[in-house]
């Protein structure tokens, strides 16, 4: 069984304190500029993913990039653990859900780091697609 809301921190006091500190950063740091920069690099990665024959449904919303490895599969696909190990072997924390690979980078990510993630997603498509 999958715990579908594993990333929810609803009303957790520590998470609320972190959220407050995060809002303070928006006042003191160029956060929107960082978001725009990450989104632009992700757009370049999207074009690369869309061109790969073993990936389907490549898409981007803001800084989030996702694609399905292979042409068939679903959220409950057993490919997820294999993909997780594949990315971990490359020192990348990329969380697949079934055969869908999501890339949700922190806003401090560099071009080189994002490109390494895109490269790994393409390698995974070659290996598992």
Language model features with spans:
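Conserved N-terminal phosphate-binding loop of PLP-dependent enzymes in the Aspartate aminotransferase
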Residues: 1-129
